[in-house]
Amino acid sequence: MTLVAKSHDRHVDLALKTHLDENLAMIKDSIEFLRKGGQRVFLDAEHFFDGYRSNPAYALEVVRTAAEAGADVIALCDTNGGMLPDELSSVVHDVLQKSSARLGIHCHNDTGCAIANSLAAVAAGATHVQGTLNGYGERTGNADLVSIIANLQLKKKQQVLPQGALEEAFRISHAVAEVTNVAPSARQPYVGVSAFAHKAGLHASAIKVDPALYQHEDPESVGNDMRMLVSDMAGRASIELKSQELGIDLSQEKEVVSRVVERVKAMESRGYTFEAADASFELLLREEL
């Protein structure tokens, strides 16, 4: 069971229109009631970080009261999304030093830092992270669990999912986008269709030698694929790699590759585009074979 409680003194006064002590009593009574009924209790301390700036003693008292009443996790909420990672990390560390609570983190993305703030909280000692798939949420969104989980597991080597589950990230992210009728972002970290896409000829030449030269992780680790884009920036390596994706080996067809490169550049200069038109590129390619 998740409860939401005010931890900012100004919100208690102006939004709840009650006394600070009464707010603490309501938190205590609610948690104890649920615990007696056998419920696990998660408390979301709303506006915690803004409250900590305003009145740190009271914000800490909310955490202590909830912990003593038996809350399993107290999630510190950056409800307005205005925190930056360095300050947030310092606050989480301070709270852990001054209470015995098991802390979680709940971030909004109003500064574009929801993912970074969540990771900073974990590094500071939080053991519970709240967020949403693809970062969906009010205003500018919540912390994207897809990126958070991938970062924790791939970068921090923390096994937060069962073995092999992370490889479902791409499929799940896009399934959720379809169900919610929200167009997926091509540039979403890890699972966007452009996350491991390459266009520049220099990149393609290096990727032929070793994909890790221009990729921070193996795209298969999150169920994604490397994509080679064909455009007016394409060189011979780009054309050869894209052709391999389509099942056509041009490694011994240097003249064909040269003609395809020139045709692509000429057509793109007239307004055509091949980046998301694999079938059109394949037709052009087969015309030159």
Predicted feature descriptions by range:
Residues 88, 140-147:
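Histidine/acidic-residue-rich catalytic or RNA/ligand-binding cores of hydrolases
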Residues 129, 143-146, 152-158:
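Contiguous mid-protein beta-loop-alpha structural module that forms a pocket-lining wall or clamp
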Residues 120-123, 150-154:
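Short glycine/serine- and small hydrophobic-enriched flexible loop segments
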Residues 20, 49-52, 56, 78-85, ...:
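Hydrophobic alpha-helical scaffolding
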Residues 2-103, 118-126:
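Alpha/beta enzyme core
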